[in-house]
């Protein structure tokens, strides 16, 4: 599903690939070390606001095909837009969190049924920060953002 960059939430899921890491200026000696990469990505998030607490979890993985990447579950004390989060992480693929704590924890750790792609989980940190998704009533804000971007009510 495609989400508007103006979509507002307090919780997001991001997939960070090497291209995104390079967009952020993270050098290979950092991003090739799963523990350093996870710490760097979570530091970027936690330091991105001086007024609210931002926490998260990170799993660094390698796909069966050899694609090295990281999954992030990100939480903010205030709402922010999907576009802001994606930009903060080098234009990484970002979506709002829609599932609960158990489902997202299982996804991050690639437990069944999320192990179907045969990814190797190289490092995980921050699982205690994963929260249950709590719906918000920002639907009108999200609809307004879509209309502002030129979408019609039927779309």
Region locations from a protein language model:
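A generic structural motif
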Residues: 68-76
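Short coil/turn motifs at beta-sheet boundaries
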Residues: 7, 65-67
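Short, glycine- and small/hydrophobic-rich beta-strand elements in well-ordered beta-sheets
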Residues: 50-65
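Catalytic "initiation/cleavage/transfer" segments centered on a nucleophilic residue
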Residues: 1-47, 77-155
């Amino acid at each position: 599903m495609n989400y508007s960059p103006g979509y507002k939430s307090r919780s997001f899921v991001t997939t960070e690939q090497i291209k995104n890491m390079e967009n952020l200026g993270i050098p290979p000696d950092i991003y090739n070390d799963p523990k350093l990469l996870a710490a760097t990505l979570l530091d970027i998030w936690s330091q991105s606001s001086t007024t609210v607490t931002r926490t998260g979890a990170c799993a660094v993985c390698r796909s069966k095909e050899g694609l090295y990447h990281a999954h992030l579950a990100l939480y903010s004390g205030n709402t922010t837009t999907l576009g802001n989060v994606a930009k903060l992480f080098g234009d990484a693929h970002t979506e709002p969190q829609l599932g609960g704590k158990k489902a997202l924890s299982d996804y991050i750790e690639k437990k069944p049924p999320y192990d179907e792609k045969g990814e190797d989980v190289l490092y995980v940190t921050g699982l205690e920060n994963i929260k249950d998704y709590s719906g918000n009533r920002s639907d009108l804000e999200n609809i307004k953002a879509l209309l502002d971007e030129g979408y019609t009510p039927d779309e």
